[in-house]
From Swiss-Prot:
Catalyzes the transfer of the gamma-phosphate of ATP to D-galactose to form alpha-D-galactose-1-phosphate (Gal-1-P). Pathway: Carbohydrate metabolism; galactose metabolism. It comes from Actinobacillus pleuropneumoniae. Mg(2+) binds at S129, E161. The keyword Acetylation does not apply. Transmembrane segments: none annotated. ATP binds at S123, S124, G125, L126, S127, S128, S129. PROSITE patterns: GALACTOKINASE (PS00106), GHMP_KINASES_ATP (PS00627). Its EC number is 2.7.1.6. The record marks R28 as: Transition state stabilizer. This is Galactokinase. The lineage of its organism: Bacteria, Pseudomonadati, Pseudomonadota, Gammaproteobacteria, Pasteurellales. One of its GO terms (cellular component) is cytosol. Pfam families: GalKase_gal_bdg (PF10509), GHMP_kinases_C (PF08544), GHMP_kinases_N (PF00288).
Length: 384
């Protein structure tokens, strides 16, 4: 059963009446451009046909009663009172979005019953958290008829995750869930928020293979990577690493390396990755899938060697996929790192070969069974 249908059904069972409306917000997969978003750089994701559905109806008070179907938990809070953190981690994504919507729209106090469910795997690097944030933001906009653009909702989602949940994410995930376009990858300039859509190549599929090694980015490694990037930006005297050219980096690389080896390696990844994204857009426009495959491979190598966010299981999956796909197409880790998924752009005629190669080897090598998803690029958040 699709999340949209399940949300509607479970709302009726849990609340005792039928939901008025349902919102769907997609997850996302990032084709190339990893950890560049919080460095004001470039990314090239697409929204995918897995996401979060929220069925909801207005109440005649200011209470939000939120039922999380997948874990059978409920959270309740009152919009007429200051919104405080919940003991449930998932509920803080909801509360955080509503809290920061109220900062922009102080009059918003419309209560609601909500039931939500997702088919985005948790901690997989496919933005289950952003899908939750954007679905809640859209729900609030509908409930209160609020004058918020989808871009504003995306930035509120990022703010909630940064300040209320405590994860220093960039803005790519939320922008993609809000603004995705059917059959398009979208290059996002994470500083200007300009979007450049480019069609997914005809005859190619997007395959996402989940290593089923889970990560949790709220603590530790993700935030330390961000701090190392900020150190490098201060070293170069710029607002963000987006502003450092390859030439300038090379000129001062030895000096940075002597001061801070990790900051040097992180900056090397970010600066080269931004260039790869720009080249990937041109490769897609030219339908040059050999070039795109090379760029994806370069991105993965850089994440492994310089940003140091891959793990052996992910590296092995990428090796298998690259062999199965060949030169026309590519594979790399996608998401924050330390587990999660790889993304593949694979010729349609090689999809089953890829599936078989992975199935025959990955579990045998790692003791973990992968999950294989074929995805389509889809529209961003919408009412159903």
């Amino acid at each position: 059963m699709k999340p949209q249908q399940l949300a509607t059904q479970k709302f009726s069972e849990h609340c005792g009446y039928s939901a008025a409306q349902t919102v769907f917000a997609p997850g996302r997969v990032n084709i190339i451009g990893e950890h560049t978003d919080y460095n004001d750089g470039f990314v090239m994701p697409c929204a995918i046909n897995y996401g979060m559905a929220v069925s909801f109806s207005k109440r005649d008070d200011s209470v939000w009663r939120v039922y999380a179907i997948d874990i059978d938990e409920q959270d309740e809070f009152d919009l007429s009172r200051p919104i405080e953190p919940s003991e449930h981690k998932w509920a803080n994504y909801v509360r955080g979005v509503v809290k920061y919507i109220q900062e922009k729209c102080p009059e918003f106090k419309q209560g609601a019953d909500l039931a939500m469910t997702s088919d985005v795997p948790m901690s997989s690097g496919l933005s289950s958290s952003a899908a939750l944030e954007i679905s809640i933001g859209k729900t609030a906009r509908v409930l209160g008829d609020l004058p918020l653009s989808l871009t504003e909702i995306a930035l509120i989602g990022q703010q909630a995750e940064n300040k209320f949940v405590g994860a220093n994410c960039g803005n790519m995930d939320q922008l993609t869930s809000a603004l995705g376009q059917k059959d398009q990858v979208i290059m996002i300039d994470c500083r200007s928020l300009d979007i450049t859509p480019t069609p997914v190549p005809h005859g190619y599929s997007i395959a996402i293979i989940n290593s089923n090694v889970k990560h949790d980015l709220v603590t530790g490694e993700y935030n330390s990577r961000r701090q190392e990037c900020e150190f490098a930006a201060r070293f170069f005297g710029v607002k963000a690493l987006r502003d450092v050219t390859s030439e300038r980096f090379i000129e001062r690389a030895a000096e940075l390396q002597a001061q801070n080896e990790l900051a040097y390696k992180r900056a090397k990844h970010i600066i080269s990755e931004n260039q790869r994204v720009l080249e990937a857009v041109e490769a897609l426009k030219a339908n040059d899938m050999v070039k795109l495959g090379q760029l994806m491979a370069g991105s993965h190598d850089s994440m492994r060697d310089d940003f140091e966010i891959t793990i052996p299981e992910i590296d092995y999956l990428v090796e298998l996929a690259q062999v199965a796909i060949g030169k026309n197409g590519g594979a790399r880790m996608t998401g924050g790192g330390f587990g999660g998924c790889i993304v593949c752009l694979v010729p349609d005629e090689k999809v089953e070969h890829l599936r078989r190669i992975i199935a025959d080897n990955y579990e045998k090598q790692t003791g973990i069974k992968e999950t294989f998803h074929l995805c389509t690029a889809c529209d961003g958040v919408h009412l159903i």
